[in-house]
Amino acid sequence: MKVLVLNGSPKAERSNTLNITKAFLKGFPADTEVEQVNLYKKDIKPCLGCFSCWSRTPGQCVIKDDMQDIYEKIKAADIVIESFPLYFFGMPSQMKATTDRCLPFMLPYMGNLVEDKNASFHELRDESMHEKRLVVITTCGYVDEKPMYPALLKQLDLIAGEGHYTAILCPEGELFIADKAKRQREGYLAEITRAGAEFAQNRALSEETKKLSLIHISEPTRLQLIS
């Protein structure tokens, strides 16, 4: 099994989100091939909106930068994990640029509305891409994930199709840098490792496991931990 981690945090290895991602991967079999790409250390230019990947050079982006190598890594992976903190209700800029540059994987929009809400807005160019699994692991500083993630999840629904990706949403991200929160942090990461083992076996998470992957601490306790 090959796993590609696209680390979209500008903190690179110091990313709090990456700690969760590594805990998730700890649940995978020992022989899993894991490759990590720190996007902020790569030369990834923004999409030009030229649509050459849909017309003049179908399936091929005309921009020659590090995305050409990332395309090949995505094609070779069985599972792609996007790991990033929530920035202004969405992806950090380098993660968004990478997402924009994945347009060559999609077929052109031909003016037909998608009736199936579980389908992506654009059809994938290569049928083999349907066999891959996408996992999105993301943190935010707010105490509740519900008001923070609707915009991001709607975008992912349109890109990948509702139910065609696995999202692990982690609010209260500041607990990962609070000295007093070690016990809560370790307990949460243990749950994430168990979730990783389940995903590695089933390529999906049960609804119960999704709930356990959320960290919620009461307001008085949270204030004590971060003070």
Each predicted region: which residue ranges?
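Cofactor-binding loop segments of dinucleotide-utilizing enzymes, especially the Rossmann-like FAD-
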Residues: 8, 39, 138-141, 170
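Active-site oxyanion/phosphate-handling segment shared across diverse enzymes
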Residues: 140-192
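N-terminal beta1-alpha1 ligand-phosphate binding loop
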Residues: 2-29, 143
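A short beta-strand-loop structural module common to alpha/beta enzyme folds
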Residues: 33-42, 167-171
